[in-house]
């Protein structure tokens, strides 16, 4: 109780330095124990509605006045050393504090009592805390000590167990010694048996020395044995060491050898590695090459397959073309036969239709497309209107029927596409020419023996198209230029069928025509007007390409002259004259179309066009070698006058010259009429490129072009196709037009080419000199050609009397030759069919002062077979024998000036006088072979 009283005594602890409590009230009620104390916010316990305060007092320091409890009541530095009894009693006192709750309730309204109770509670709590701290400290100390003691006890237990084990071991050892001692002294043991527990110590003491001595002896003996064993082991060890050393030396030696081998092997390995690397590179390179070669092989295989396919296709195409070619050759032969028959029929019809008493020269050397030819024809027609003809009505009906059939044939002609059938290209297709070749018009009559040589110019084509215009109707309006028919059509079969009908009609009337022809020939012979050989009573003096009793298919196949505007009835039937045909043709050419896109234009260069690498300035003469000639010359002397000369090799065919290409044009269409008193004219040609090889059909006679460079007529069907666009120089002359213009006081320039001297000076064979440089048939790219330094110009020299120039036809030349030589001409010297009674050229010649020479001898008709060419005879000697398609160099009677490069355009020379009254001498001229070779291609 004394302790409790002591604790309850209020003891005011002094506040520590810096300690202060502050009470701050939210209602501005400040309760302070000093002026500088902090404010404290408290909650009043007297009333429930009092404002709340926040305590801002520092609990570490107490207060210095009695209004507040000064804490802590016990200094932290005070050491409370209480005994266990004190602590126990104090705790009991604390447990009795619950009894004071009622006291506090009773004194609730007494502030002082409550304060004192709170102070007591504070002191009790603080004291209890101090007691608890001291107890915890003591408990911790005791716990640590207890753990330490437990560890020590564990160690002690281990030591005790070890000691016990050692003690047991020693006890067993002692028992062992004791048992051994008992065995050594059995008597003593037996006499005086001792218990174990009692005699153990004495036995140890008794036997200790003996056992030790015995053990010492045993140890010494054992030591000696061990020493001997050690010596033996040492000796063995030395032996083993020596062996080991020897073994080591051997190993070192082997190792050294192995190192040397390893070094050498390493070097070899390095070399092998390098070789392997190099070989690997080579293998890689070879593999790449193999891959490339495989790719190339695949590409080559693919290409090979393609080429094989192309080759197969080419072979199939070749076989097909060969079969088509055979068919075309068969059709060609059939068409040729029908063509010859149609030509003969047409000629006979013309003979029957028109009387032979007043036939004028229809065509001079004017081309079909020239205005001069139309002027001449118009004038002649006006003159003919004065003397009307009265032909037989039956013959007119036959003519009308023939023309009607021909129009049907023209309408059904084939439109097979051909590179020549291009509108505006001045050409027509071969098939078009084939089926329209038999059309007889006043302006164009074509006779020929070889349809492969057929090419129609645009003039003739326009006439044929106008002829069929009435029959075709609106069909022509749907056709566009340059749009031919499709291949394989039945046009050819239809045309052949119609031609076969015409052939039957012809065969039925042929006999009548032949009888009528013989009757006329007899009448002419009786009158003494027949002076030449094979006479054909037609208006064509050169139409020898017929089968007749007098000329068995002579070499002049296709050299037919036609009457242009002399036949008004036929003109009304075939072509109604609507203005100028030439102007109409020019109007067609002026219409824009793509037909002539491949034709060259002067001053216009086609994009991508390349000319041939040939010398354009080279000029070829007739005496040059052909590339296929053997160099043999046919002797011009010693030939019989009327003996046919056979040439077995005249049918030689050279397909390498069958191609041609038009690159230059020499079309001299002019109205200048050749007059003896005019000036000379010089014409210089201009070439775009060299012509392609022309077809050549000769192998013996050199310098014989296939087609005439300059012919005084329109080329026939057979001749004009020999070269697709034959080179000709169109220089027109007309005897009739000259006379008509002269009567009206019109004169023109003089063309006096040296080669036109057809009159000759004496014997033509004896006066032959190689002065002419005419154009050979060999193309410029031929290896047998003779180049010239510069391109010659058209230079005409007057080497003959002036009246030679306008007499450009063959009969006129013969007449002049007769006049100059003043001697008659044998009847065998003429191979042309001339109806003397129908010629009025002599009347015109008389007006120029030329006497008429009449030979009343009978005409001797030479016979020619198909394998023989025609025979030309000069006045005094044998004529020159010509191969098919050739022309003799002498005289060049058909008007090719010296040095003229061949014209690549088609317009040809139109025949001169058709009916003449004088015999004709054909000493040197254009002769077509009896049989033209078959061409392998229509191109």
Curated annotation (Swiss-Prot):
Entry coiled-coil feature ranges: 106-354, 490-524
Record note on modification: O-glycosylated. Glycosylated by OGT; glycosylation in response to increased extracellular glucose levels is required for and leads to regulation of mitochondrial motility by OGT.
Domain HAP1 N-terminal: 46-353
A single Gene Ontology CC term: mitochondrion
InterPro entries: HAP1_N (IPR006933), Intracell_Traff-Reg (IPR051946), TRAK1/2_C (IPR022154)
Pfam entry (one): HAP1_N
First-listed, main subcellular location of the protein, grouped into a coarse class: cytoplasm
Residues covered by region (Interaction with HGS): 359-509
Alphabetical list of SMART domains matching this protein: HAP1_N (SM01424), Milton (SM01423)
Descriptive protein name: Trafficking kinesin-binding protein 1
């Amino acid at each position: 109780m004394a302790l409790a009283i002591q604790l309850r005594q209020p003891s005011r602890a002094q506040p520590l330095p810096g300690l202060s409590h502050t009470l701050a009230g939210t209602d501005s009620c400040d309760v302070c124990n000093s002026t500088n104390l902090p404010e404290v916010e408290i909650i009043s316990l007297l009333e429930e509605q009092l404002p709340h305060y926040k305590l801002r007092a520092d609990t570490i320091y107490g207060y210095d006045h009695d209004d507040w409890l000064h804490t802590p009541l016990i200094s932290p530095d005070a050491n409370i050393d209480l005994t266990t009894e004190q602590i126990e009693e104090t705790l009991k006192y604390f447990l009795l504090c619950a009894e004071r709750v009622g006291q506090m309730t009773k004194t609730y309204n007494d502030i002082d009592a409550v304060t004192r109770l709170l102070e007591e509670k504070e002191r009790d709590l603080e004291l209890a805390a101090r007691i608890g701290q001291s107890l915890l400290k003591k408990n911790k100390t005791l716990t640590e000590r207890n753990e330490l003691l437990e560890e020590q006890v564990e160690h002690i237990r281990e030591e005790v167990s070890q000691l016990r084990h050692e003690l047991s071991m020693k006890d067993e050892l002692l028992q062992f010694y004791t048992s051994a001692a008992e065995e050594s002294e059995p008597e003593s043991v037996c006499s005086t048996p001792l218990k174990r527990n009692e005699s153990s110590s004495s036995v140890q003491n008794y036997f200790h020395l003996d056992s030790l001595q015995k053990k010492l002896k045993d140890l010494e003996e054992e030591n000696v044995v061990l020493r001997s064993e050690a010596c033996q082991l040492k000796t063995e060890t030395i032996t083993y060491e020596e062996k080991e050393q020897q073994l080591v030396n051997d190993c070192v030696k082997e190792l050294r050898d192995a190192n040397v081998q390893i070094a050498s092997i390493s070097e070899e390995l390095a070399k092998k590695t390098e070789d392997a690397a190099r070989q690997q590179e080579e293998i890689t390179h070879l593999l790449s090459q193999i891959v490339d070669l495989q790719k190339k092989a695949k590409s080559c295989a693919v290409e090979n397959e393609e080429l094989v396919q192309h080759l197969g296709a080419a072979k199939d195409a070749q076989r097909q073309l060969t079969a088509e070619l055979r068919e075309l050759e068969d059709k060609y032969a059939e068409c040729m036969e029908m063509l010859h028959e149609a030509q003969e029929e047409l000629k006979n019809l013309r003979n029957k239709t028109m009387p032979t008493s007043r036939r004028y020269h229809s065509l001079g050397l004017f081309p079909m497309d020239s205005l001069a030819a139309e002027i001449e024809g118009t004038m002649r027609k006006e003159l003919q209107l004065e003397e009307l003809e009265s032909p037989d009505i039956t013959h007119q009906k036959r003519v009308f029927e023939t023309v009607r059939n021909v129009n049907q044939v023209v309408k059904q002609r084939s439109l097979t596409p051909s590179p020549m059938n291009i509108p505006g290209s001045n050409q027509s297709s071969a098939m078009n020419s084939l089926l329209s070749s038999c059309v007889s018009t006043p302006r164009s009559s074509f006779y020929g023996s070889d349809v492969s040589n057929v090419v129609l110019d645009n003039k003739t084509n326009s006439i044929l198209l106008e002829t069929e215009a009435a029959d075709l109707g609106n069909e022509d309006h749907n056709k566009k230029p340059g749009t031919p028919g499709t291949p394989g059509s039945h046009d050819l079969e239809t045309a052949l069928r119609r031609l076969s009908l015409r052939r039957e009609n012809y065969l039925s009337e042929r006999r009548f025509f032949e009888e009528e022809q013989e009757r006329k020939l007899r009448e002419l012979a009786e009158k003494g007007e027949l002076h030449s050989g094979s006479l054909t009573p037609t208006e064509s003096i050169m139409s020898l390409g017929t089968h007749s009793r007098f000329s068995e298919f002579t070499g002049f196949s296709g050299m037919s002259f036609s009457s242009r505007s002399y036949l008004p009835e036929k003109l009304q039937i075939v072509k109604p004259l609507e203005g100028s045909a030439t102007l109409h043709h020019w109007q067609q050419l002026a219409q824009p179309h793509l037909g002539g896109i491949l034709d060259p234009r002067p001053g216009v260069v086609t994009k991508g066009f390349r000319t041939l690498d040939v010398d354009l300035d080279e000029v070829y003469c007739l005496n040059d070698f052909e590339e296929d000639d053997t160099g043999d010359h046919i002797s011009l002397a010693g030939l019989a006058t009327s003996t046919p000369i056979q040439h077995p090799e005249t049918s030689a065919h050279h397909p390498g010259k069958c191609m041609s290409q038009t690159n230059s044009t020499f079309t001299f269409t002019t109205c200048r009429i050749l007059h003896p008193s005019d000036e000379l004219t010089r014409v210089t040609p201009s070439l775009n490129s060299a012509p392609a090889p022309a077809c050549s059909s000769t192998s013996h006679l050199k310098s014989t072009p296939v087609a005439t460079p300059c012919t005084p007529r329109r080329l026939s069907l057979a001749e004009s196709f020999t070269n697709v666009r034959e080179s000709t120089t169109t220089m027109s002359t007309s005897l009739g037009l000259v006379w008509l213009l002269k009567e009206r006081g019109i004169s023109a320039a003089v063309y006096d080419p040296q080669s036109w001297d057809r009159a000759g000076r004496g014997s033509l064979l004896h006066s032959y000199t190689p002065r002419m440089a005419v154009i050979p048939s060999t193309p410029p790219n031929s290896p047998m050609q003779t180049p010239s330094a510069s391109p010659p110009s058209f230079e005409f020299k007057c080497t003959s009397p002036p009246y030679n120039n306008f007499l450009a036809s063959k009969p006129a030349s013969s007449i002049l030759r007769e006049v100059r030589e003043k001697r008659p001409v044998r009847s065998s010297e003429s191979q042309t069919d001339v109806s003397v009674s129908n010629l009025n050229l002599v009347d015109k010649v008389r007006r120029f002062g030329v006497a008429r020479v009449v030979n009343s001898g009978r005409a001797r008709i030479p016979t020619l077979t198909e394998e023989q060419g025609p025979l030309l005879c000069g006045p005094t000697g044998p004529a020159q024998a010509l191969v098919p398609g050739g022309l003799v160099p002498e005289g060049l009677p058909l008007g090719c000036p010296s040095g003229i490069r061949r014209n690549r355009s088609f317009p040809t020379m139109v025949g001169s006088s058709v009916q003449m009254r004088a015999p004709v001498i054909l000493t040197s001229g254009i002769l077509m072979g009896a049989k033209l070779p078959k061409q392998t291609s229509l191109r």
